[in-house]
Amino acid sequence: GGFTHIAFNSIALYFFGPVVERYLDTRRFTALFFGAGIVAGLAQVGSTLLTVGPFGPGVVGASGAIMGVLGVLTVLNPGLRVYLYFIIPMPLWVLTFGFAGFSIVAGFGAFGGGLAGGNVAHLAHLAGLVIGLAYGARVKGNVGVPNSQEFGRGGGGMGGPGGPGGPGRGP
């Protein structure tokens, strides 16, 4: 938890969100984001109630929503080149499943914090990812995915700066 966690969520949404929104559309992106966040948050709250009781840490679900976005993008464009920490190049699927593996080990492994996860909602991450992967598989044949994607412009979503209809671009 904490500021660093919020910062990484914000960075991920800034870079991945507009790309997924372009693939889906604003309405479906919004439904995915809130749906994955709500389901992920409920999964984490349920597991916390079962393992720690009613006095466990609270959860917002934003990480699950971000992982849902990442899951959809991984299904739609698994080979998309991304940069871990803005330095290490890798295909998106490696980043996604590497992060999922980390959440499994940190949340459930011998050195992890259990389902409470040391104030990180690891089950929410995983639940959001599963929702995103499933939704991506469902819409894969119905959305246009370009062979290559100009990536890293962030904020270029529908109507945003650099996006279709946004400032600096034609309609």
Please give the residue ranges for each predicted region.
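A detector for small-residue-rich transmembrane helices and their helix-helix packing motifs
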Residues: 1-171
